[in-house]
């Protein structure tokens, strides 16, 4: 895996080993950022971060900050290794449950311009109710939430859908904050 564009274009990144981790491939990541558009100065939240590929891509493309969240120890350590390798600043890594992080950020009044959600596909149905109740409270006005899922699934959140596209076995759905 590599960074697609920006200040760290072409840099290879580490991926955590394990059955639960399915890093977003280069092709899908490039498509995601083509759909999103410029992220200069954005505050980004990368939920279920895994390798951190999505948030790292955002930082490389000019995001002001990124918060990486993954409950898995190896995944969180991998994100830290990638940040160190790439020399990217403006990042925090939390090894905790995504729902807990959303609740903490909402209580603290923290808002994000871009939220990237890429849970293990088989777990998405379990996480959707939590996302539906907690995600809107951390979205800044006119921000975006990107949810990756299996191509056959269509995630539903209480937010307007900007677009939903299939890329092989992956569906990418962009939700807009009101």
Predicted segments — roles?
Residues 1-178:
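Class I S-adenosyl-L-methionine-dependent methyltransferase catalytic core
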């Amino acid at each position: 895996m590599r960074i697609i564009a920006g200040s760290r274009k072409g840099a290879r990144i580490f991926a955590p080993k394990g059955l639960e981790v399915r890093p977003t491939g280069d092709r899908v990541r490039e498509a995601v950022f083509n759909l999103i558009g410029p992220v200069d100065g954005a505050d980004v939240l990368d939920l279920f971060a895994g390798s951190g590929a999505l948030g790292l891509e955002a930082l490389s493309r000019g995001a002001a900050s990124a918060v990486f969240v993954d409950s898995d120890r190896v995944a969180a350590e991998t994100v830290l290794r990638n940040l160190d390798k790439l020399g990217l600043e403006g990042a925090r890594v939390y090894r905790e449950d995504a729902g807990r992080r959303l609740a903490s950020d909402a209580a603290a009044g923290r808002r994000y311009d871009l939220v990237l959600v890429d849970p293990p596909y088989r777990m998405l149905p379990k996480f959707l109710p939590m996302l539906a109740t907690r995600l809107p409270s951390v979205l800044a006005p006119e921000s975006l939430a990107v949810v990756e899922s299996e191509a056959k699934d269509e995630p539903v959140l209480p937010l307007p859908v900007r677009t939903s596209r299939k890329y092989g076995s992956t569906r990418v759905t962009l939700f807009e904050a009101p």
